[in-house]
């Protein structure tokens, strides 16, 4: 059991280092999400910017150092000034659509999401609209074009 924990910590450190250095993009982080630690209420002031954490079904990268020790509402999905959501280009790993916050979290060409059980691929950069609200910015993925 200790060996598995040590291996898991090493895997998490390796993917975090790649995220921080820019070697691992959001698609790579989501592909390795089983190795990414789960967010918890703690002090993030000494955590390097870009370090990935999982919260709910999403993967986020630390955007701004902060201390969430006494801030239970500073979760990545709510404290959007502190975290950046990751998107993927892999339809098999598509996550539910999440509205961007400001200039972060926008969908770029090739990013995928789900809405209503359907997988969509963004056909434009800086896409802030959900597929049903702006269908011309998305292409529905089918078995033929996945």
Please place each PLM-identified region on the residue numbering:
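Tryptophan-rich substrate-binding surfaces of secreted polymer-degrading and adhesive proteins
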Residues: 1-146
């Amino acid at each position: 059991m200790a060996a598995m924990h040590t291996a898991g910590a090493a895997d998490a450190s390796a993917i975090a280092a790649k995220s921080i250095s820019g070697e691992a993009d959001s698609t790579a982080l989501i592909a390795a999400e089983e190795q990414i630690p789960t967010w918890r209420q703690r002090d993030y002031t000494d955590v390097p910017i870009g370090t990935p954490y999982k919260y709910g079904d999403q993967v986020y990268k630390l955007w701004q150092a902060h201390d969430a020790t006494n801030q239970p509402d500073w979760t990545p999905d709510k404290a959007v000034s502190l975290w950046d959501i990751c998107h993927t280009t892999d339809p098999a790993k598509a996550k539910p659509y999440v509205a961007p916050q400001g200039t972060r979290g926008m969908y770029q060409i090739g990013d995928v999401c789900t809405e209503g059980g359907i997988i969509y691929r963004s056909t434009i950069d800086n896409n802030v609209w959900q597929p049903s609200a702006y269908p011309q910015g998305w292409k529905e993925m089918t078995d033929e074009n996945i």
